[in-house]
Amino acid sequence: MMPLKKRQRQTLVCSNCKRRKSRCDRGKPACGNCIRLGNRETCHYFISPSEKGGDGGDSPGESAGSNGALERWQFVRAHSCGRVDLTAGRTVVFGKRSAVYVAGVLSTDAVRYRDLYLELLSVFSHAAIKKTVSQLHAQAQVGAQEASLPNSVKRVIRMEDEGMLQESSPYILAKHKKVHQSLVDGFAQSRYEGRQQFADVEEAAKQHLVERYIFLQKVLPAFKKHVLPLIPIYDERMLCVTVEQLYDDYQKRGKFSAKNGDLITVATILLITRLVYLAIRFDKCSVVNVKYNRILELDTEPYAALAYELLPRDKLLRKVTLPQLQCLILLRFHNWCSPMDGDGESLQYSNVLMGTIYACCKEIGASWLSFKEPDKYDFAKARGSNSRFTMAFAEMEPGEVDSANESVVKLYQQIWAVVLHWDRNVSMLTGLEPIIGTSMKPAAMSSYNNWYADMISLDYLKWQLLTRINEDPSEVNLEEVKPIISEIRQRLGQFTSESELAFEQELILQLVELSILHAAFIGPTSNVSAAEHRKNYQELLERIIHLSGIFITYFHDPPTTNHQYGRFYTNKIVEVAMYRVYQILTGLILRISSACQDQSLKPTLMKFYKNLCSLYFNELGYDYYQVFKRLFEAKVKYKILEQTANPVFIMLRYLFAEIQSGNMESMKSQELIGLIYGEYKKMGGELNLDMMDLWNHIVPTQCDHNIGLNSLFTTEIFPTDQYSDYNLFVSFYDYASNKLTEDTNQAAEKSIAHNPSTSIHDLCKGGASPHFDLLEGILDPLDFMTYLDSIPGET
């Protein structure tokens, strides 16, 4: 009898629990036992000693691991087909002087740290900043007008002012100086008023309280018509009664009553007025609506800062009332719409306020319970002891109390629907776990006739999507995620609303898909076929083009004869989307510039990149502070990508020169630097070593798919000569960015053109150019502010 033939398949053994697993399951980073015991990070598989030998050939997994990356980096990132790692093997925590926050796996920050090309750019920025503080400090003197701006902006302003004196064209000089000074003055004033402290809060409330006639006859009707549909958290009658009661009491007494909740009502009036002001200001209709001129004459800049001061004075962190909760939600809404940095550069502040709002909802009973058992709510004891509830029932007969109960329950349901929707949206934008940890599938609520009530029926799908992502973000199953997104989009199509909220929801879904696709594209290629990798690459470019078309339509094709008072709201999601596309496109151009022999696609992408930046900064840079802060960063990046044949070579040249000179010892603790330096030592240290060979050894990159992709860009989607009169992106900081890059570009061209294989040792012996240290010093605004704001004597 012939012996049974054994299967010739190597057994993989866990390094922790010594359990075996079949090689077909190797794509999973860790065994189930180690995951259960919390030993995921130390779980690795090795070939069982009894099965080593044979012909001595490496398995595909072994050959992939010997490609230069450290075992942890290579192994954690290895996944089976259909799965993607959104974490890049780590949970990144960012910090600056005023905040510490974790980077969500779907956020724009995640795009930067997931792509090692962009991370190298970030590390390079850190190193350049530290070396340039003293040089920038000498140029930091600015006038008192810009005193409230960050030091990072002050120094660039000073450098730019030097360049104005050298302009040749009088017209361009006058135009540039006017725009430059207008932007600086405007943002400086807004930052000052938005961050000011009030010595006497009640006196400030009296000073800024909107006149009764203007608020009741101008502001409140506009709020009900244009803003309240976007955030339906008020009963219109209750709101009117409360506001009129405040004005009556203030007229009689001449002061506010804390016991009656007057300060919360004042904060509500201020925030409502500010939101209406923003709605009118960002309307792009060419026909001026003169009935709102009185509102535009108000100085609403300090209103949000004053509301922040008024809210805690009613013991908000200890207890809460319904008007306080509504005011908090209104403040959250304002922070999202604010042209200043209300939610933070990475939306990190939104979760803090959302957590407070969620706790307040639970405290007053606005939760899923209001949908499950609405008939069981009894507000009798609240009516008897709380004047805010009494106002809702004041004009009702005893027999109408039941209908009043129903109106309050309905208000609770609307508040919960709004809070739930905001929580899910922020989670889908950032990838962070949602604050509200439960969901349900309620019946349709046709009686509400608003967007948030419709979205309640979709919440269980959003919850499933976020659960799939957050259960194990290092191994997201695309076969589970994609159908959920498709079903959400299909269900959204059933609601025929063309409101700003529908536009925002669709754009958020597209950003989720874009982030997941980006993670799949830059992930390890050892377990992905060349055809699949090219497919991801092409789809990524197609999505970038598609989203850019949405941006162009949004800015250039709005109806100019109809008022669009909702643009103050949708501008924010468009800004978030454009910035994410901008970051991804930067990484793609970096890869093409440094890893592809076929450079035919780079000029096309650079033209597209310039047009996208021009659209972003010309449409949003005049009004939005976060966009303004990124202007110089984007200008320097563009010049590096455009004028340098191999940007990665430039960055590696700088970093290794610093290592050799002993200036970067502390930075070796950073994982990427430690990885690069470790591989550098393994490959011969100071011997003649091609830096690009070193980089490609660490980050193997498939970049042979450019042929034929130029056809994607044959149709010109950007309007020609749209900003021919004055292009903010092209003109602004032109002198300063040239000053930072001029010497380095010359050095790079000489090094790469004449000796592409220049060794690290030879480069380190060369003298540093005077402006090379400034090249990327302001690439990351947060880092730049962190270092420069700590200089003694600076404000």
From Swiss-Prot:
SMART domains: GAL4 (SM00066). Pfam families: Zn_clus. It is found in: Cytoplasm; Nucleus; Mitochondrion. Residues 14-43 bind DNA. It comes from Eremothecium gossypii (strain ATCC 10895 / CBS 109.51 / FGSC 9923 / NRRL Y-1056) (Yeast). One of its GO terms (molecular function) is DNA-binding transcription factor activity, RNA polymerase II-specific. The gene is OAF3. This is Oleate activated transcription factor 3. Belongs to the OAF3 family. InterPro entries: OAF3, Zn2-C6_fun-type_DNA-bd_sf, Zn2Cys6_DnaBD. Keywords: Cytoplasm, DNA-binding, Metal-binding, Mitochondrion, Nucleus, Repressor, Transcription, Transcription regulation, Zinc. Transcriptional inhibitor with a significantly increased number of target genes in response to oleate. The keyword Transcription regulation applies. One of its GO terms (cellular component) is mitochondrion. Its main location: cytoplasm. It comes from the Eukaryota. One of its GO terms (biological process) is positive regulation of transcription by RNA polymerase II. PROSITE patterns: ZN2_CY6_FUNGAL_1 (PS00463), ZN2_CY6_FUNGAL_2 (PS50048).
